[in-house]
Amino acid sequence: DYYASRGLGDVYKRQGYSVLACNYRNRFGEIDIIAKDGDTICFCEVKYRRDNGCGRALEAVGYSKQKKIISVARYYLMTHGLNEWTPCRFDVIAVDDDEVTVLKNAFEGSQ
């Protein structure tokens, strides 16, 4: 969700990160937040669940979604003068009702 990811970028800002992009899109898909933590580029998926009837927010980032995020991230790196040796990680910000959980290194980028 556009508004959720823009507002949740503040979670990173409060931790001293620089938010590089919100709702970044390319031909491979979208990444909700791209931020920089020191030298590390953080690619973050935001998931929101109002109730647990469809499962918790963290459970919504399955293998196929991870692969898509990785493809978008690789293209981002390539088109921004970066390469595969650039330190990066994949995070998930999960919002269940009013509970916000930041899961750093939620999955590996080698899939």
Residue spans of the language-model regions?
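A generic beta-sheet turn/junction motif
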Residues: 26-28, 37-39, 96
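Structural motif
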Residues: 28, 41-43, 87, 100
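Domain-level recognition of nuclease-like catalytic cores that cleave nucleotide substrates
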Residues: 79-111
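Mid-chain, well-packed structural core segment of small domains
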Residues: 53-82
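Single conserved hydrophobic/aromatic residue that forms the stacking wall/gate
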Residues: 1-9
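Conserved catalytic cores of phosphodiester-cleaving nucleases, focusing on short active-site segments
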Residues: 31-57, 69
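A short acidic/basic microdomain associated with nuclease active sites
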Residues: 13-27
